[in-house]
Amino acid sequence: MRFNLKAPFEPRGDQPEAITRLVEGLRRGDRFQTLLGVTGSGKTFTMASIIERVQQPALVISPNKALVAQLYREFRSFFPENRVELFISYYDYYQPEAYIPTKDLYIEKDADINDLLARMRISALKSVLTRKDVVVVASVSAIYASGDPRDFQELNISLEIGQRIPRNELALKLASIQYSRSEDISSGGVFHLRGDVVEIFPPYEDYGIRIYFFDDEIERIISFDPMNRKTLEEFDRIIIYPAKEFVTTEEKIKHAVKEIERDLELRAKELEKNGKYLEAQRLKQRTLYDLEMLTTLGYCSGIENYSRYFDGRKPGEPPYTILDYFDKSEMIVFLDESHITVPQIRAMYHGDHSRKKNLVEYGFRLPSAFDNRPLTFEEFLESVGQIIFVSATPGDYELSVSTQIVEQLIRPTGLIDPEVVVKPTQNQVDDFIEEVQKVIERGERALVTVLTKKAAEMFSAYLNELGIRAEYLHSELDTVERVEVLKKLREGSVDVVVGVNLLREGLDLPEVSLVAIMDADKEGFLRSETTLIQTIGRAARNINGKVLLYADRITNSMKRAIEETNRRRMKQLMYNIEHDIKPESIVKPLYENIFEEFADNEEKIEIAKNTYLDGILALKEDLEAEEYLALLEEEMWRASSELRYEDAAMLRDEMLRIKRETKKDNI
């Protein structure tokens, strides 16, 4: 089936030219292009239009779950007749395995899998393998391991009318590709045997399959609604794909066990040779237990650490990911919010490797654990075809590699970028209160950014004392609490949100007409050019948008951010005059789950980051001062590039503390 874009409007403003130029670039064979699109300019519609024009499968990667949910919903509305799939981590809760030597603390892996998200991942894999009209909207989970696409495609069951196959044999085949015999159909991946009928519930479909037998011959194949059991469609032939993302054969398990036994012997000898007898004994005990489980059950806890044995990969070779399910020569990749997504992809491998280093060195895991990992950035680039970076503030990398930078600065709604006003820091709080009162009188909302978590808490408390309904937002609030604060702001039960890094939320708040940036002249992570432009953009969805920069001097970052905002503002104003457009605020329905849809899943990231940061700080005792400082600096810049400014600030403070201690010791 061909992509068929459905929308109640045609491309407007800069969209027609942007679509044409980017499509020409794809057809020309350009490897990298950038769509520089401002907030509210319709970047998602532009991406959808490009997909329809070129008729190629697409992978859209976005940096957080809130944006993924938003994009998934929008692409589904644009392509109701085609397959739009979602591919994010399937964990509701995730505690990664880790070991902190200084505390002799082993943290066991703990996880809860969300059945719905697991089924959606399988649906995505199946769609990519079997269709051309597919858009997959993914998080950075796209660079983490998935099953071998050859196994997923080859280990299917083909059934057709007239085929002879005993029902018990069919049941065994279904079990071999991870279907279980059960009456509970809520999670999919199950089947029933009822007399001459076999009912199968694939996890990737919202309907069941019913196979009618006459003796051992298939007589009829239908799909049916599991709720009312009504027949939906008749089939002559059907293919049943695996019920799980990771499937393998008994032969591969036997071969893997032999390989693991060989590597265990070699690694144990290596540890003993280095005098690490405790570590060698620990490794033998843990690995032999895993091998026993694999031999008897075909599964063990932490089986992913042995994935390269099942995949037949050599040490160091990249894992299979959803990228391997695509035809590289046909796919298009859109990196949404690329100024965040590119650094995020770069950082994933290093964080994973650092955590596993201790597990391997101290005998908790074989070195094969290193090969259950995300792709490196270079491997990611090798795995995909043409890339279009999408951002209002593309990073240096995107700008340097792109054949063309296509601007999309005109908003179809006529909304102009907010007016930016610089005011002195003296009496900045009183001035803001005066400004926010006007906003509240109009029934609108405000955002304020400050430099520290303590300042956010104190400022919000002070506003509440004055009768202004305010809440604070920072990294110590868990995902559910952050979701609730933003929901209150949109509903109107809160007028002001005070935050430190308001970029992490993927905010889309048309009710916000005022953004205030306190101490805007304090150069650093939170006041860089990119951060300022992105924060200014938070007021760009409201006709009364205004931004206050409280500063006693104009920094270079402020100057560039103001100049760029004014350039975009003037272009929109000229367009509005030329086309007689009257600006209108964006009206966006308050979806109950706009931020909540995958909120619980976000815990995985929070927990992984916290464990990893604890691990970095715990390395102080194991490293020389210079090595420790170098590691802290590397991780600080990585956190900054991912816009995790609070983590970056914590690492910076630790660096300064170590430098002060070193200076004292040298006196």
Swiss-Prot record:
It is found in: Cytoplasm. One of its GO terms (cellular component) is cytoplasm. Residues 24-195 form the Helicase ATP-binding domain. Keywords: ATP-binding, Cytoplasm, DNA damage, DNA excision, DNA repair, Excision nuclease, Helicase, Hydrolase, Nucleotide-binding, SOS response. Pfam families: Helicase_C, ResIII, UVR, UvrB, UvrB_inter. A motif (Beta-hairpin) lies at residues 90-113. The keyword DNA damage applies. SUPFAM superfamilies: C-terminal UvrC-binding domain of UvrB (SSF46600), P-loop containing nucleoside triphosphate hydrolases (SSF52540). The keyword Membrane does not apply. Belongs to the UvrB family. Forms a heterotetramer with UvrA during the search for lesions. Interacts with UvrC in an incision complex. The UvrABC repair system catalyzes the recognition and processing of DNA lesions. A damage recognition complex composed of 2 UvrA and 2 UvrB subunits scans DNA for abnormalities. Upon binding of the UvrA(2)B(2) complex to a putative damaged site, the DNA wraps around one UvrB monomer. DNA wrap is dependent on ATP binding by UvrB and probably causes local melting of the DNA helix, facilitating insertion of UvrB beta-hairpin between the DNA strands. Then UvrB probes one DNA strand for the presence of a lesion. ATP binds at residues 37-44. It comes from Kosmotoga olearia (strain ATCC BAA-1733 / DSM 21960 / TBF 19.5.1). InterPro entries: Helicase/UvrB_N, Helicase_ATP-bd, Helicase_C-like, P-loop_NTPase, UVR_dom, UVR_dom_sf, UvrB, UvrB_inter. The beta-hairpin motif is involved in DNA binding. Its main location: cytoplasm. This is UvrABC system protein B. GO terms for biological process: nucleotide-excision repair; SOS response. GO terms for molecular function: ATP binding; ATP hydrolysis activity; DNA binding; excinuclease ABC activity; helicase activity. Residues 428-581 form the Helicase C-terminal domain. The lineage of its organism: Bacteria, Thermotogati, Thermotogota, Thermotogae, Kosmotogales.
